[in-house]
Design a protein with these regions (language model features):
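Solvent-exposed segments in extracellular or luminal domains encompassing
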Residues: 75-93, 168, 264-278
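C-terminal beta-strand-rich structural cap/linker in extracellular carbohydrate-active enzymes
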Residues: 745-763
Length: 763
């Protein structure tokens, strides 16, 4: 089936890519508008504009954009339009038809009002002056233009460089880059006041009919929560403005049935007779108010159960169509930079990693994430030259599969680093593309010369003077997802390795279209973990796509705490910011203090702060991640692991954190509270700004994975200071389960006290 996937949601000014699934490169495809909002320039019968191809350029700059086509053709040399880009110009519902080799498919896009607001980013001229000369040009670099240098330019205004932008509310990190030199960039934050995104959860009940002649009804209720207030910039949402939109999946019912079901929604409730439902139907609930949020989806299936007689009682079962694998709900992840893991003498091979699996088991690791293992001319492996062959210096595919088997024997899952946003420019496909071979003409995106800062005299081709790339990454050109041939080949790559490994970490996930990730999520085996590298983390990558996300909010906060720029209590703010962004599930975050792209926390902030930061990652919900060497005292971010001269006490500290997390279900899936007992923690001796406390309590809905929702809450106290802190804790805190602090002592009328070195976990 070439159906284009679920209904899509976006807002005015935020383009969405639409594409057939399981594409046939030799098939013929075409898109036609069936319906559009009254205020849109699109009309029924319209087709993609042949003079506007590919995703639209950055829409962040104010006053510089020219009128854009609402429906753009794909960036290919084909006569048909397999992939199109909708750049909505009005709120409402757009309905499109995809004519494909297997028939006609319906695609709806629900568009909410424009969320962008105007702001000026200003940087003093003196901050960007190098060698006593002013730059000729200054580029704005940030996620809102997909980190493309030279796409948005700042203008000189007196003694400042100014970029006028239009972006959603929030704090947006940016760089002003002089003359394409990112090493000389000035970084800062653009503050755009406004509300966060709402969050939604669904509750379902079957309401029995009073009249036996009538059908029982399915009642879906959307609980919509407004965003919390983080500060004066990232303010809370208006609860009175909240609502939910219910969208029935067009793949599961004909348009008439879809309209009949959706018409029975009233506010946040959808009540439908069971007789009106197909045997299996997916329903998406989208929260919206001042802004819109990520949808939650349920699949409603007929469930014929036998009663005490022989009659079948009509009922339904509700199924999560993209559940997180049970093993991946809260695993301890260990990232290995593959070419440095064996130490400073032996070359790292799959065999050498396999010989050290016992160490991973000893440490308490649940999942091993390996940086790329495929053929590549680089040490880091992110410039892939062959998607089907392992790197020769690491070993054969058989040796890799032997490593996977050894991990499985130890109860450890293996996560594969999937690099499909780009290839190496040494990949044969790019070389053939550059040489003008027709079959590869559409395999890579192209840009005009003004967007290229590499200084390379690229081979001239139709479609653009230079290959498209992010930052100054001229060695890794971006693949073109408008090409059905590219999509087909990369889906084949996913299939190839999904049969071998247990999960994928998606490199530069933010560069690959959402529609493709939705297809991958539906395609891989049900027990496959999907982890996205999206910076900053974005809740829409959890909308039928990824199970776990980089927690960039906590990562940045732990760095700021380590540097003394924020107090330890900013951990609470980091979690609130995740909710403000629109994340509903704390457990869907990978918590980390460093990785292969970042400086070592130990080298930057010291051993005491590292131990505290690591303790935070292990005592919050989510998936704690150790970057190999973090636990051994490594100070170089990609250097060899310190085996013979490593810090064994630091290693044991991490091992005990993993063991305690495994032993205490509340540390894995309990709720987090900063009020209650946590608010009663008081620093008696030590630096109060370096201490934070929070409580892990039984989940509000359902039991813990240990099967006991009545377990006593756990009080976590973390100290980032180099010296121990003595804290007064509320009565009832009897024992330090971690054992890093001294025994809890009674202190007369003052309650109880505990000395906290790095962390205490009290019951």
């Amino acid at each position: 089936m070439h159906e284009p996937g679920p209904p899509r949601t976006t807002s005015v000014g935020e383009p969405v890519e639409l594409a057939p699934r399981s594409p046939d490169p030799d098939g013929t495809y075409g898109w036609t508008v069936r319906d559009a909002p009254a205020d849109s320039d699109l009309s029924p019968g319209d087709r993609p504009d042949p003079d506007a191809t590919g995703p639209p350029s950055s829409a962040t700059a104010v006053g510089s954009e020219t009128p854009t086509a609402v429906l753009r053709a794909g960036e290919t040399s084909r006569d048909d339009d397999p992939v199109v880009h909708l750049d909505p110009d009005a709120p409402g519902t757009y309905v499109l038809a995809l004519d494909a080799p297997d028939g006609t498919h319906r695609q709806r896009v629900r568009v909410f009002p424009d969320e962008r607001r105007e702001a000026d980013i200003r940087v003093p001229v003196d901050d960007l002056a190098g060698n006593e000369t002013d730059p000729d040009r200054v580029s704005l670099l940030w996620p809102h233009n997909e980190n493309r240098l030279a796409l948005d330019r700042a203008e000189r205004d007196g003694d400042e460089w100014v970029a006028s932008v239009r972006v959603p509310p929030g704090r947006h990190g940016f760089g002003f880059v002089p003359d394409g030199d990112r090493s000389a960039a000035v970084h800062g934050e653009c503050e755009v006041p406004g509300p966060g995104r709402p969050r939604v959860s669904l509750d379902a009940t079957v309401v029995e009919a009073d009249d036996p002649e009538e059908s029982d009804r399915l009642r879906l209720t959307a609980a919509v929560d407004s965003a919390p207030a983080v500060d004066d910039v990232e303010r809370g949402g208006d609860p009175d403005a909240l609502d939910a939109a219910f969208l029935v999946d067009d793949r599961d019912a004909d348009p008439e049935a879809v309209a009949a079901i959706e018409s029975q929604a009233e506010g946040r409730t959808l009540s439908v007779p069971l007789d009106d439902l197909p045997d299996s139907v997916r329903i998406h609930a989208v929260p919206h108010g001042e802004r819109y949020g990520a949808a939650e989806t349920v699949r409603v299936e007929a469930d014929e159960t036998e009663t005490d007689g022989s009659e079948a009682a009509a009922s339904v079962a509700l199924v999560d169509p993209n559940p997180t694998p049970e093993w991946a709900e809260s695993p301890t992840i260990y990232e290995v930079f593959v070419r440095s893991f064996a130490g400073d003498t032996l070359p790292t091979t799959f065999r050498e990693v396999e010989r050290r699996v016992e160490y991973l088991d000893h440490l308490g690791v649940d999942a091993l994430w390996l940086t790329p293992v495929l053929a590549s001319p680089t040490d880091h492996g992110y410039h892939v030259t062959d998607y089907y062959d392992t790197a020769a210096d690491l070993g054969s595919r058989e040796a890799f599969e032997s490593l996977v088997d050894a991990c499985h024997d130890a109860g450890i899952r293996v996560v594969f680093d999937l690099v499909i946003n780009h290839t190496s420019r040494d990949h044969p496909a790019f070389q053939l593309h550059s040489a003008g071979v027709d079959a590869y003409a559409d395999h890579y995106r192209r840009s005009d010369a003004t967007a290229d800062v590499t200084g390379i005299d690229w081979a001239e081709l139709d479609g653009g003077a230079a290959p498209d790339h992010y930052f100054e990454w001229g060695r890794i050109p971006n693949l073109n997802y408008d090409s059905p041939a590219v999509r087909e080949r990369l889906l084949d790559v996913v299939d190839e390795w999904a049969a071998v490994v247990d999960g994928f970490r998606a490199d530069v996930a933010w560069g690959v279209p959402h529609g493709f990730w939705k297809e991958v999520a539906d395609r891989v085996p049900a027990d496959t973990l999907l982890l996205d590298e999206t910076l900053p983390h974005d809740p829409f990558y959890g909308e039928g796509e990824f199970d776990v996300h980089y927690d960039t909010s906590l990562y940045e906060t732990l760095r700021s705490i380590g540097a003394g720029e924020e107090p330890a209590e900013a951990v609470e703010t980091a979690l609130a910011r995740g909710e403000w962004l629109g994340f509903d599930d704390h457990g869907a975050q990978m918590r980390y203090v460093e990785n292969h792209d970042e400086d070592r926390y130990l080298a930057e902030y010291g051993r005491a702060a590292l131990r505290a930061a690591a303790a935070v990652t292990f005592t919050l919900p989510g998936a704690p991640m150790i970057y190999a060497g973090q636990e051994r005292g490594n100070e170089t971010y990609r250097g060899p692991i310190r085996w013979h001269d490593g810090d064994n006490k630091l290693t044991d500290f991490h091992r005990r954190l993993a063991a305690l997390r495994e032993a205490e279900p509340l540390l894995r899936d309990g709720d987090v509270r900063f009020d209650g007992r946590a608010s009663g923690v008081r620093v008696v001796e030590g630096d109060a700004d370096r201490v934070t406390a929070y409580e892990r309590t039984p989940p509000a809905a359902g039991a813990t994975d240990g099967g006991d929702a009545d377990r006593d809450p756990l009080l976590v106290v973390v100290n980032f200071a180099a010296e121990p802190a003595t804290v007064a804790v509320p009565d009832g805190a009897e024992a330090d389960l971690f054992g890093d602090g001294n025994a809890v002592e009674r202190d007369g009328e003052e309650g109880r006290r505990v000395a906290v070195d790095a962390v205490a976990v009290l019951r």
